[in-house]
Regions:
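Conserved RecA-like helicase motor-core motifs
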Residues: 29-31, 105
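Short, well-structured alpha-helical interface segments that form or flank functional binding sites
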Residues: 11, 15, 56-57, 88-92, ...
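Long, low-complexity, intrinsically disordered polar/charged segments
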Residues: 12, 19, 23-26, 54-84
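Basic, amphipathic alpha-helical patches used to engage nucleic acids or provide basic targeting signals
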Residues: 67-120
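Active-site metal-binding core of divalent-cation-utilizing nuclease and nuclease-like domains
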Residues: 6-8, 31-69
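Hydrophobic, Leu/Ile/Phe/Ala-enriched alpha-helical segments that form helix-helix packing faces
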Residues: 16, 20-24, 97, 129, ...
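Basic, glycine-rich
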Residues: 101-153
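Nuclease catalytic cores
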Residues: 1-21
């Protein structure tokens, strides 16, 4: 029996993390593959299914402020997330993050070279090749990071 190290992120996640880094100033830190239970506290009134999910789920990217308090979660979506089981997990994760007051953005490659950043309320599509609408994508990320200053964190 042998155990070997492996990469923490795939190529898509690596590109997304690099993009996020360019959108933030030195005040914020990006953490990858962080368990929900590392940055959210459990409420004893949570239903059993959400409790189980809470302890077994992680986020793709957690952005924290300089005090390491959560500001924003970015979930990297692939076509895998179109399956009903994955949608249910995404729904549970969104519910838990909403209860914790941590904003959530999704990112997804829509078509070759087009990156979609979206929440329940808004969306930005950014062209990775031409840079068109990059400032809009950056502003959306910064807006959600800034919202955390007003949220119960």
């Amino acid at each position: 029996m042998s155990i070997k190290p492996k990469r923490l992120v795939n190529a898509y996640e690596e590109r997304m993390l690099e993009f996020l880094q360019t959108c933030l100033d030195g005040t914020y830190k990006i953490h990858t593959q962080v368990s929900l239970c590392q940055f959210c506290e459990l409420d004893s009134n949570l239903d059993i299914e959400l409790k189980k999910f809470f302890f077994s789920s992680s986020v793709d990217a957690l952005i924290t402020n300089s005090d390491y308090k959560p500001c924003l979660v970015v979930d990297f979506q692939s076509s895998y997330h179109d399956y009903p089981e994955a949608r249910e997990r995404d729904r549970k994760k969104a519910t838990l993050l909403a209860l914790a007051g941590v904003p959530l953005l999704y990112s997804r490659i829509k078509e070759f070279g087009l990156l979609q950043l979206y929440s329940q309320n808004e969306e930005v599509i950014f062209n990775l090749f031409t840079g068109e609408r990059r400032e809009n994508a950056k502003a959306l990320i910064q807006k959600y990071c800034g919202l955390s200053a007003f949220i119960n964190v």
